[in-house]
Amino acid sequence: HDQLRLVEKIYQDFERGGANLPAEKQAELRKLNQQLSMLSLKFGENVLAETNKNFKLVVDKKEDLKGLSDDVIAAAAETAKKAGMEGKWVFTLQKPSMLPFLQYAENRDLREKLYKGYLNRANYNNAFDNKQVIADIVKLRDQRAKLLGYPNYAAYVVDDNMAKTPENVDQFLMKLWAPALERAKKEREDMQAMIDKEGGKFKLQSWDWWYYAEKVRKAKYDLDEAQLKPYFKLENVIDGMIYVANKLYGVKFIKRPDIPVYNEEAMAYEVQEADGRHIGIFYMDFHPRPGKNAGAW
């Protein structure tokens, strides 16, 4: 049964790759794939540029930092110093900089500015604007799907998944949608009640969500996320991850400072089987920096 499934999967992959198409259609498919590959690369480069380079929230007055922890303020001061703005504080669209600000900063206007900066990445009608890139990707994806015999791109994507059809996906999402919406409405009501209690004369907006969700959580459960941070120091997280991998899969991670890395912040580990056989090299790269895609790798 497993071998039959493997053969079916391989055949389907060839079919989805255009193996059954006549030669001229295969050439057309290759061209579409090349264009989509270049556009996808361009999309990512634009988002990366907008995230890392083209937006900075510069704070001049210390009172505008109210609500932020000392380590977040210190990191913003260091970012400002590196940008040649010593004595100020700079927040970027990188998650470790942006999320604490949205979650804890009391200055609502600055939260709005930072949130909208993130929301509008690659949407400023400049060299990094993605509107036309997205339109081109949508058009080419539709062409590729139809070339391969599918009615649309959605049908092409889910054909080899468990859902099989876009209609099944819609039905599944609709089952989730109603209870999720009710839960979100309840959370919104709790946050609006907190705003009203504090004398706020405004309706909850998107840039308020993290801030008031944290306040409601703290009021309801006496839980302050900032107090959890000492338990999740990077060294502890790495040790925990390695421990779990060893328990689940029996593999070992051995730190290898002798192996060259592409950046001084990256760390190299050799991964071995339980008996010491070499599996491969694993790089860990946790910190944001200019030119790097967001997130820990």
Predicted regions and their residues:
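Recognition helices and adjacent regulatory flanks at domain boundaries
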Residues: Q103, N123, N130-K131, D136-I137, ...
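Second-shell loop/turn segments in exported
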Residues: F14-R16, S97-Y104, A122-A127, V157-V169, ...
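His/Glu-rich zincin catalytic helix
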Residues: K95-L99, Q103-R108, A268, P288
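Substrate/cofactor-recognition hotspot
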Residues: E24, K95, R111-E112, Y118, ...
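Extended, charged alpha-helical coiled-coil/arm scaffolds that mediate oligomerization and mechanical coupling
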Residues: D2-V47
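Propeptide (latency) domains of metzincin metalloproteases
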Residues: W89, L99-L102, D109, K113, ...
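Short glycine/proline-rich turn/loop motifs
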Residues: Y115-A122, A219-E225
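Active-site-proximal, well-structured secondary-structure segments within enzyme catalytic domains
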Residues: L6-E8, M38, E45, A49-T92, ...
